[in-house]
Structure formats: C-alpha cells, structure tokens
C-alpha cells in the first residue's frame, strides 16, 4: 500500500482494542526481520546476536503517506489523533496534509441510542472525512510521481531504534 487511512472512534481516550492489536503487530514492519532463517525461526539468542552485530532496523513502512480521522462523542479525540499521527510519523510514514489529520466530535454528549442519527445529520463531519481521503489520494499520487519527498531523506538517523 502506498497510503494508509485510519478512521476510528475514541474509547475513553484510547484506540479501540482491534486497532491497538494492529499497531502491536506492525512492530515487525518497523525494524523487524523479514528472514526467519537468520534466527532459526525464533531463537532469542540468535536474534540477540544478529541485533548486536549491527542490525539496521529497516523501516518497511517508511515513505508511505497517511491520513487519520478520529471521532468521538464525549472526550479524547485530540489525544488519540496525536498518538496515532506521532506513531505513524515515528515509523517514517509521511502525513498527507492538514486536511488529512482530523479529530471531531459527533453527537457531543448525546445518548448512544441516537449516535447513528447524529452521524447521518453531521454532513460537515462527512465532508471532513471525504477531504481526508481525497488529501490522502493526492499525496499518494504526488509520492508515486516523485513530487512528494520527505524533507529528511538521505539523513542518517542517530538513534534508529
């Protein structure tokens, strides 16, 4: 994938558990070893020797662009948006742009029973999500054509882990 868009609710200032599980699995995409034979499967001593011998921490997702939309009905949307965008930036992904990184409240402090109706009525939020997706598409096209380059390309990371 050239780009990733995460759209999620906030639950008590946190990401939903399924998103947390995905993030945990993606640790292998940020410095992980694609060659299981080099560690004999999962032999920890071989893995430690390999790392201490000068592991390059390959960033398999670096250079891909991203968009994040976080929505909630009471609290925590801004915190979660920052957590997700910081994490994606930390692993070398590129934010698509201002309109692609949003946090919004839908049906603020209204009953759960009306949340679907609140979403249907909130056409501004729907436009925000649409703009986030369109911004991501434009960033993907710019990245593929070489017009969008990370400003830190070619620099050596002093502390790669």
Residue spans of the language-model regions?
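Glycine-rich phosphate/pyrophosphate-binding loop and the adjoining helix
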Residues: 78, 85-161
